[in-house]
Amino acid sequence: MEEERKIEELQRLIDTHENIVFFGGAGVSTESGIPDFRSVDGLYHQQFAYPPEVMLSHSFYESHPSEFFDFYRRKMVALDAKPNRAHRKLAELEASGSLVSVVTQNIDGLHQAAGSKRVWELHGSVHRNVCRGCGAVYDAAWVCSREHEDGRGVPVCPACGGPIKPDVVLYEEALDQDVLEGAVTDIARAD
């Protein structure tokens, strides 16, 4: 009963507002089979050779690229994940004109896969992997294909041989200022 009341209240808020901004994180994508970080089944409660916050740091990417990409491919990229009801409902709200934008901490790209157009990805996206040499961009499937690797399992750019870095914000890195400013601007317009 309590959950039903909350859903009705949420629907009332949606129906009575015109400039909605949705701010979400890992919980939105768990129904799509993507684990969060802090729940009982989350990444922080699983056993790895190093803690996840270490493996997802910039210094670990630099010093242990093979282990970084092994973890990244196995635990951060979910090529088979599909948008769930929440992703689809948000895209529907955007199409109706009620939703200004989605601000997300998720890196899975499921909001866009559901049809959302204005998505501020605070932590980046696994679907963009950038050559640090020439700036070429490769998708997640390319990184997971293992077609272009050095001898350590680290993806390298076929155009220039430069190392690839996922366009995700790692520990020790700052958020993208343009993304942050866009999200703050939209949030300030929300009613």
Region roles according to the model:
Residues 1-191:
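Conserved catalytic core of sirtuin-type NAD+-dependent deacylases
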